[in-house]
Amino acid sequence: MEKKILQFAVIAFVFFAQSSFAQELYMPRNIKKAYAEGTRSKDGKPGKNYWQNHGKYNMEIAVDPKTKLVSGTETIIYENNSKDTLRNLVIRFVNNLHKPSSPRGGSVSDDFLSEGLTITSLKIENEVYKEDAKNWGTVGNVKLKKPILPHSKAVLNIQWNYPLSKESGREGQIDETTFFVAYSYPRVSVFDDYNGWDRLPHTDRQEFYNDFNDYVFSVKAPKNYVVYATGDLLNPDEVLQPEFAARLKKSYTTDEILHIANEQEMKSGIVTKQYDWNVWKFEAKNISDVTFGLSDHYLWDASSVVVDKKTNRRASVQAAYNVTGTDFVNSVKNNQYALDWFSNN
């Protein structure tokens, strides 16, 4: 009798366990809500009601090689495409990673540290905001005086500055006259359909989650500095001497690798226009970020490659590198191959 009872208990346990495992897997409530509202679908595709917010950024940025200070002004037209009323704006400035008080995923040297972002002026819909960005980490919160209603826009005007870090890792001072200027502007953080505002700090141990925005921006740099940036250079004739502007334009139409500026030409100071400062203008659309570098002695190569054989559309391929960086001599060639393969296979 006891044996039969034991057998029954084992069978009952197995049946109960199978029934338990057959239940629906755990799903966070915000994901369930997104499925229910049709912004996401279980096949991984955007739902029928999917949306993203969007920004149009118009920026004027200047880099002073003497003071190592980056300064800028920007106008952001921010589109709230959600059904939510936004009562706060979350501003992201990744370069505040260099502040001593910011959390980081590892130890850093003293040369990595800097004072971080200073906002000298902030207006939202022409309302003045007194925000002390010195209290921000890589993410700051602005409580709005007037909320941004669903399917409406808000205009932000920001003036800011920050020092380039002496230690070059992801960005900063590469040498005394070469700088990689990344994460250089305050931006509106992502507001999405299942997490709301992205308030997670950047700790130098992850990549980035950004809206896809449109950018028109300029970089002001001293004469003899070449600026290399995301997007299309809009004014080569205004910043380059005619011979070098012609070389760059030719590179847009050929598979041939051209030396836009070699070592001797950069040393001779004959590449850029000889105003005290040149303003380099760029445009990039539907992209998650923009960045730029500048140098008064880096070599500059360029070519292009067909990335759409139906329309014959070409993409520019460029490289800027120190004369000692012999591995980069083949950079344009290698990137031509990569772009061609991924575009046509």
Predicted segments with their positions:
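N-terminal, polar/Ser/Thr-rich
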Residues: 22-71
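A surface-exposed beta-strand-loop module
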Residues: 69, 79, 107-178, 263-278, ...
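Solvent-exposed beta-hairpin/edge-strand motifs
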Residues: 86-127, 182-185, 220-225
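Glycine/proline-rich low-complexity spacer/linker segments in large multi-domain proteins
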Residues: 101-113, 161-215, 235-237
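Short solvent-exposed strand-capping/beta-turn motif centered on an Asx-Ser/Thr pair
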Residues: 66, 79-83, 222-224
